[in-house]
Amino acid sequence: MLCIYLFILVYGVMFLVIEQLFILGNGFDMAHRLPTGYEDFVDYIKREDAPDDEKILLDFLIHYIGEPFYDGDFLWKDFENKLGEADFSQDISNTEYREDQLYDDADKDSDYYAYQAIAPLSTIKHIAASLPYIFERWIRTVDIDKAKPIENFRRLIRQNQATFLTFNYTKTLEEIYRESHVKHIHGAIDGEKILVGHGNHLDRVHTYEKDKMNPLTELSSIDDINYTLRSVDAAYNSWSKDIKQNIIKNAGYFASLKAYDIKEVYSFGFSYNDIDMPYIKIIIDGLKNPCNIKWIFSDYNEDANQRYERVLRKNNFKGIFARFHSSDD
């Protein structure tokens, strides 16, 4: 009986009291004057004393993303969308041309052509795969100790009634506001693995059919090429947040949100990008009293807020909208 009582006492309070959900994006950290903007990341990998892997990544991103990479108006959501549009098709076509030589020139060294085919794609694989690691290296340089709490935001939080879903990797909530009911959905410093990138996870795999090859071609060479072609797909996916898989991984968390009697959803610095909307859709679908919910945006950008309202309506949000003042000015 004691165990049952403790279960009800601890878990019952946890499930019944939570009435506030805060959804936080990068604008939240930037409102605390933390250098976590896209431009800050670019400045980091452009610095003169950057190690070679960061310089190589910079050149690589310029090549595959183009001039917008340097645009001062470029935001994280723009960067993520551009990563999703990265086109390796020319590199793959070049490889397929080299593959053709494997069987067109049967009198030549197939291993030589195999190497020529896979070398450029191997480079793509290694450089693209470095992005998450370099990103994490950068985010670890952000000094949260320099941030000060925003009192207008702090006053919104009702003790033991608030839960936080953050898309940030920093521990701003934990260290500046001493909050513990925090879910870092894309990972965090000194926490779960960090997810960064676009949302276009590939299921397809590039391969070259062995029956098209010259019989004299070494099967090991063909296997090497196919392995590297698959690696290009893996490199593209290393730039992706596999949202579908991440939702499955965090199914328990989203189930717990459904158990709460959420009455207010506060949104601070979150951009409602298509990539992250599957999470928001799950939240909307799980609200107990959808018509009575207030979805409350930071008043930082009213034009953006009106766009967000339209996005939420399209995703079947039936409640009302409001604003809160997000600075102490």
Question: What does each model-identified segment do?
Answer:
Residues D143-F153, W239-L257:
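A Trp-anchored, charged/polar loop motif used as the substrate-binding/catalytic surface
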Residues Y11-M14, D43, T217, D223:
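N-terminal non-cleavable signal-anchor helices
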